[in-house]
């Protein structure tokens, strides 16, 4: 019974993260997705692929706010410097900060790393029961990209719990 319940909770977490990856919500922060690493997402002056480019964003760039309703697949956005339009298929919403560090031994910490690898440089150490961790829409091989206390980095997902 416990295994069944744990499986359901795990699946809900996977589906919740997947749902956020496709969700675009006005007023919320989003990240750039579905762009090759050697390419850039164009922020355009108007909602058209033919409109002039006002800025370019890399895959994984976050801090992009959708400022209004999307129209015909195009969303008005701003990044703190410029305003423009992007196609919604290149945006994924950042999760609310609902996750906490768990399953870490008393007195131990969870390493926030630069890349999804246990060999990667440690950026910060997260204490047991530390909360307000937001999932960014990127995951790889059991690692989750997160934002916490002003840091962005990767943690092993098995040490996080939340909604």
Residue ranges and their predicted role:
Residues 5-14:
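Bacterial N-terminal signal peptides
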Residues 16-21:
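Sec/Tat signal peptide C-region and signal peptidase I cleavage site
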Residues 22-29, 55, 64, 78-102, ...:
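Boundary regions of SH3-family modules and the immediately adjacent low-complexity/disordered segments
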Residues 26-37, 65-69, 101-106, 132-137:
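A structural signal for short, hydrophobic beta-strand segments that form beta-sheets
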Residues 28-29, 38, 72-74, 81, ...:
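Extracytoplasmic
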Residues 35, 41-43, 57, 75-77, ...:
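Fold-core signature of tandem repeat domains
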Residues 45-68, 114-138:
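SH3/SH3-like (including bacterial SH3b) beta-barrel domains
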């Amino acid at each position: 019974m416990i295994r069944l319940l744990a499986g359901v909770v795990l699946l809900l977490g996977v589906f919740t993260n997947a749902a956020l990856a496709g969700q675009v919500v006005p007023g919320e922060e989003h990240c750039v997705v579905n762009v090759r690493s050697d390419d850039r997402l164009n922020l355009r002056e108007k909602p058209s692929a033919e409109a002039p480019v006002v800025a370019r964003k890399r895959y994984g760039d976050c801090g992009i706010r959708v400022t209004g309703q999307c129209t015909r697949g195009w969303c008005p956005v701003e990044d703190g410097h410029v305003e423009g339009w992007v196609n919604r298929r290149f945006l994924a919403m950042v999760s609310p900060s609902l996750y906490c560090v768990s399953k870490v031994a008393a007195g131990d910490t969870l390493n926030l790393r630069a890349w999804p690898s246990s060999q990667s440089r440690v950026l910060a150490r997260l204490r047991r029961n530390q909360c307000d961790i937001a999932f960014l829409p990127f995951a790889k091989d059991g690692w989750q990209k997160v934002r916490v206390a002003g840091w962005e980095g990767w943690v092993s997902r098995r040490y996080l719990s939340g909604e």
